Amino acid sequence: MQILAALFIDDMDMRQVPGPATRIDLTGIQFSGPAPAPMPYTWTPHLCVIVHCPPDQNGFSALTVEFELDGEQVARNVQPLQIEPGKFGRQLVRPEITFERPGTVYAHCSIDGGAPVSVPFTMLAPIGG
């Protein structure tokens, strides 16, 4: 399996279209934002990981996401992947990450220990703070 994309999002919707085919609608894709409350602030984002399973694979793997802040792992999520060979799938990951001050967290996403896809998110200071 391979990761096609990993993004921090506000919401996601899946819908059927003629074909039959499926559409994944992502809204509120983000790479930075102000903390909505004073720091320290605990953030629980939606990380959406889009995955493809080639037709010649069995459709079973494990997705690992390690979240790194200031060079230190602050959260880790491991979940099974089951995607029909030749198809696409999506996984949602919801960590809890506490920011003591503004900074950038990196989500390092990998399948079965393969090369990671890394996605940053920068937490900015609260507006007016």
Task: Label each residue range with its predicted role.
Residues 1-46, 125-129:
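Non-catalytic, glycine-rich low-complexity segments
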Residues 44-46, 84-94:
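Aromatic sugar-binding surface patches on proteins
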Residues 48-54:
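Short edge beta-strand/loop segments characteristic of extracellular beta-sandwich folds
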Residues 57-59, 101-105:
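Short tyrosine-centred short linear motifs in exposed loops/low-complexity segments
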Residues 65-69, 109:
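Conserved aromatic beta-strand anchor motif in extracellular beta-sandwich/beta-rich domains
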Residues 74-85:
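Solvent-exposed serine/threonine-rich low-complexity stretches and specific carbohydrate-binding patches
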Residues 81-82, 122-128:
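Short beta-strand edge segments in extracellular beta-sheet folds
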Residues 112-119:
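Short acidic/polar inter-strand loop motif in beta-rich domains
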